[in-house]
């Protein structure tokens, strides 16, 4: 099994609902995001390029790419981050993490975050999934592909809450899975393929 995701850039309109769903479901501390949306457009933030009516603006939601050859795992000195061979998901073990930050430096996608201080929240009770990972001081965090939800037979929160239905999820080894069928026959790209990390997130272009 090899879990992966496809994101249709023709359907994504940059609303950031995926980022908010991720933050809420995982009860992420203040100032921490596992999911973000990058816009490819004009010279200034969130603007299109070109001259009306021929303008272009493309949105790329970015989270952990759950690489087949993760640079973060190769850099981690304690084995706290590794690729689960049964699911293909890159896991972060906070019990082993010493907060050294080498994985953050190694990741070419800039999707890892360090809890430098005691995690703080807008409210004093969990807002998200009670099975979501706990947050600890001086540990690194990242997208988990919502492993807690997958274990219950659900899909990642970012996919479930996407109003544009731009995300597809499933087993990349299964040609009949939603993600495999979404990729079939479409032009695709993966971020920074030249790094040799072999990401498990595909962008349909």
Q: Model segments located where?
A:
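Non-ligating segments of multi-cofactor redox enzymes
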Residues: 1-205
């Amino acid at each position: 099994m090899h879990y992966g995701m496809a994101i249709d850039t023709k359907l994504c309109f940059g609303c950031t609902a995926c980022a908010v769903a991720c933050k809420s479901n995982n009860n992420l501390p203040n100032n921490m995001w596992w999911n973000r949306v990058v816009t490819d457009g004009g010279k200034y933030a969130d603007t299109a390029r070109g001259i009306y009516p021929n303008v272009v603006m493309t949105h790329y939601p970015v989270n952990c790419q759950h690489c087949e050859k993760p640079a973060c795992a190769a850099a981690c000195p304690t084995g706290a981050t590794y690729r689960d061979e049964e699911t293909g998901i890159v896991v972060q073990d906070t019990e082993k993490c010493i907060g050294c930050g080498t994985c953050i430096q190694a990741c070419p996608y800039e999707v890892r975050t360090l809890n430098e201080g005691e995690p703080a929240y807008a409210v004093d009770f969990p807002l998200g999934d009670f099975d979501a990972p706990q947050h600890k001081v001086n540990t690194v965090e990242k997208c988990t592909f919502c492993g807690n939800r997958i274990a219950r037979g659900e899909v990642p929160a970012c996919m479930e809450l996407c109003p544009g239905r731009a995300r597809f999820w499933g087993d990349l080894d299964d040609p009949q899975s939603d993600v495999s069928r979404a990729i079939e026959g479409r032009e695709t790209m993966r971020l920074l393929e030249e790094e040799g990390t072999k990401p498990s997130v595909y962008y349909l272009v």
